[in-house]
């Protein structure tokens, strides 16, 4: 039987200079207690490169692999490419519609990472119909779904398979948020490849007032936004 892997996960850390010391302490503690760190988007406050540099400098000397996806805050200032570059300079592996395989004490952990996007959930979903702008939103989510499908297929031979998102793939982890805004917090379309491939776990953030745990079929889905978990990092055995 394959050994479990200790994962520390957090979303919505919103790095900026005033939080530098707090982030340094929290990331050092996470590295001591885990074998892999996952960051579920909104890594910066407003998507500025200097904010990303704060996080990169905090993470630069940590002894564990760190894998991340960007969130909506990281795109806000139109500098997502620079934010990603700054993070990767600090040794953070940033996934955008991509996957990576991390070896942890002989265990291959496949991570599929993509931001996800909006669109709503069954019964209240944005359709692929109407104005071009609306259909572009639908298309953007389609690209995210296709990336999940490709990535999950690519890591299917790994000992452990996890999905890392920012937006929610299920309504279950949105409970606590006002229902009228659920369409802006995630998309049920993201659930299809997850339900088909059945990874060991899914991690996301974004929904600050949501619920910590849900499921897609038998797959556990964890909302690791720090506002939900109430801690700097939540720890998981996968």
List PLM regions with ranges.
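Charged helix-capping and loop-helix junction motifs
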Residues: 24-25, 50-56, 82-86, 180-189
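A short, N-terminal amphipathic alpha-helix
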Residues: 32-36, 150-154, 192
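Active-site environment of divalent metal-dependent phosphoester hydrolases
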Residues: 14-19, 44-49, 73-83, 101-104, ...
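Binuclear metal-dependent phosphoesterase catalytic core
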Residues: 1-4, 81, 102-105, 175, ...
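Conserved catalytic scaffold of divalent metal-dependent phosphoesterases
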Residues: 13-15, 81-184, 225-226
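Short, structured coil segments at secondary-structure junctions
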Residues: 62, 90, 216-219
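Active-site neighborhood of phospho(di)ester-bond hydrolases with catalytic His/Asp-centered motifs
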Residues: 9-11, 37-42, 66-72, 93-98, ...
């Amino acid at each position: 039987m394959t050994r479990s892997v200790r994962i520390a996960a957090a979303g919505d850390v919103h790095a900026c200079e005033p939080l530098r010391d707090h982030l340094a302490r929290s990331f050092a503690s996470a590295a001591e207690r885990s074998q892999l760190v996952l960051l579920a988007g909104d890594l910066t406050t407003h998507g500025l490169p200097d904010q990303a540099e704060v996080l990169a400098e905090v993470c630069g000397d940590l002894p564990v692999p760190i894998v991340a996806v960007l969130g909506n805050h990281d795109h806000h200032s139109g500098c997502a490419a620079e934010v990603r570059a700054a993070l990767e300079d600090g040794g953070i592996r940033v996934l955008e519609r991509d996957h990576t395989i991390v070896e942890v004490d002989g265990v291959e952990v496949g991570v599929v990472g993509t931001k996800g996007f909006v669109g709503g959930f069954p019964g209240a979903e944005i359709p692929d119909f109407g104005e071009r702008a609306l259909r572009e939103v639908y298309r953007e989510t389609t690209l995210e779904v296709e990336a999940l499908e490709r990535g999950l297929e690519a890591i299917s031979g790994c000992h452990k398979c996890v999905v890392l998102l920012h937006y929610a793939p299920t309504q279950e982890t949105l409970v606590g948020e006002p229902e009228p805004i659920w369409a802006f917090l995630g998309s049920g379309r993201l659930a299809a490849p997850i339900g088909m491939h059945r990874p060991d776990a899914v991690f996301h953030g974004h929904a600050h007032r949501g619920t910590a745990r849900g499921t897609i079929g038998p797959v556990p889905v964890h909302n690791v936004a720090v506002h939900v978990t109430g801690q700097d990092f939540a720890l998981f055995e996968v």
